[in-house]
């Protein structure tokens, strides 16, 4: 398939730049893959849509305040986006500057902090830099980020981070710091909604996938089969695997809350021929899911509406069916559903209930 097969016109007015103050008040489009029926709801209706015994699987990653601002020694402003923390004093990062960044170059954070960052390695093929934090008056890089870092909201918001993002660009259940983007399907769940679901007999489990900045990057090759995914760190515990097996045994649905959960679960199942022998997984994955992929674990998917020509819409098209997802997206646009991280949600089920 061609990347252009996933191109559509997304009106700017449908891109939410700010979140709903009440998480579960967003709209919810429900698509039944077997009947191809589309229905319209609010996210707070989810308890009436799911069944007792269904299993919701969340990504428990948490966004780190990974964006830093500083200056070069020549006085030029720079922006540094931490991609991955390597140890207490080193990280891999993007550096955005009006000047070419050189090996060994020094940057200064803030105006009075006297914290220096040195470029100690350049990954040219990835446009990334390995940096070392010097004269740091903190225990480690993470404690520095927690003090002076900014929440790395998506570039399509076209604004700086604000106080509201520190709360609402995090899920209420996120516990493991490591992402520089939120698992946005989970942003719609508030504590009250989760408790309602639990009281109705709907089960909950977790995986961990730390999301990098490449989640915002478009696919730049003509044929999608030639696209190379970025590394993402994944953990799928044995207790989550056991919850999945019990759910399958009782004929309920395994529902992935977000594309990151899909990638984590399908990675864990990648090299197994039978669900009964799936084991826990911990490590990096480059799984790329696009139409033609055969899903091994996931029965249903909760996800936001994604950018054209992105790997995320390709994954959703693989799950819902390519022609189906074009029809669903057209319906969402016609009815003014909001798109992207702070937008509305959709629920795709592969079984008519």
Swiss-Prot record:
SUPFAM superfamilies: QueA-like. Its main location: cytoplasm. Signal peptide: none annotated. GO terms for biological process: queuosine biosynthetic process; tRNA wobble guanine modification. It holds the Pfam family Queuosine_synth. GO terms for cellular component: cytoplasm. Its EC number is 2.4.99.17. The keyword Cell division does not apply. It is found in: Cytoplasm. It catalyses: 7-aminomethyl-7-carbaguanosine(34) in tRNA + S-adenosyl-L-methionine = epoxyqueuosine(34) in tRNA + adenine + L-methionine + 2 H(+). GO terms for molecular function: S-adenosylmethionine:tRNA ribosyltransferase-isomerase activity. Keywords: Cytoplasm, Queuosine biosynthesis, S-adenosyl-L-methionine, Transferase. It is an enzyme of class 2 (transferase). It comes from the Bacteria. Pathway: tRNA modification; tRNA-queuosine biosynthesis. The keyword Transferase applies. Transfers and isomerizes the ribose moiety from AdoMet to the 7-aminomethyl group of 7-deazaguanine (preQ1-tRNA) to give epoxyqueuosine (oQ-tRNA). Belongs to the QueA family. HAMAP family: QueA (MF_00113). Monomer. This is S-adenosylmethionine:tRNA ribosyltransferase-isomerase.
């Amino acid at each position: 398939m061609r990347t252009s097969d996933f191109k559509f016109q997304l009106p700017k007015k449908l891109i939410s730049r700010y979140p709903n103050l009440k998480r579960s008040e967003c709209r919810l489009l429900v698509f039944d893959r077997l009947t191809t029926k589309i229905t319209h709801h609010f996210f707070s209706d989810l308890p009436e849509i799911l069944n007792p015994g269904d299993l919701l699987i969340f990504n428990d990653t948490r966004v780190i305040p990974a964006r830093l601002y500083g200056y070069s020694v020549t006085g030029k402003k720079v922006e540094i986006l931490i991609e991955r923390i390597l140890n207490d004093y080193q990280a891999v990062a993007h550096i955005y500057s009006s000047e070419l960044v050189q090996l060994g170059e020094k940057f200064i954070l803030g105006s009075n902090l006297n914290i220096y960052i040195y470029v100690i390695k350049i990954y040219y093929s990835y446009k990334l830099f390995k940096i070392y934090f010097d004269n740091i008056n903190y225990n480690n890089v993470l404690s520095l980020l927690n003090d002076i870092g900014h929440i790395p909201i998506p570039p399509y918001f076209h604004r700086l981070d604000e106080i509201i993002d520190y709360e609402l660009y995090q899920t209420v259940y996120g516990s493991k710091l490591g992402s520089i983007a939120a698992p946005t399907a989970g942003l719609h769940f508030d504590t009250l909604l989760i408790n309602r679901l639990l009281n109705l007999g709907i089960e909950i489990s977790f995986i961990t996938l730390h999301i990098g900045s490449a989640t915002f990057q478009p696919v730049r090759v003509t044929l999608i089969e030639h696209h190379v995914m970025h590394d993402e760190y994944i953990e799928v515990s044995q207790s989550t695997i056991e919850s999945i097996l019990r759910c399958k045994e009782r004929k309920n649905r395994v529902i992935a809350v977000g594309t990151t959960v899909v990638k984590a679960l399908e990675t864990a199942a990648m090299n197994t021929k039978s669900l009964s022998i799936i084991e826990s997984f911990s490590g990096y994955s480059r799984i790329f899911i696009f139409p033609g992929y055969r899903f091994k674990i996931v029965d249903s998917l909760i996800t936001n509406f994604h950018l054209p020509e992105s790997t995320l819409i390709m994954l959703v098209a693989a799950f819902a069916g390519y022609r189906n997802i074009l029809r669903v997206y057209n319906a969402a646009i016609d009815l003014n559903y909001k798109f992207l991280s702070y937008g509305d949600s959709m629920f795709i089920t592969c079984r008519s209930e």
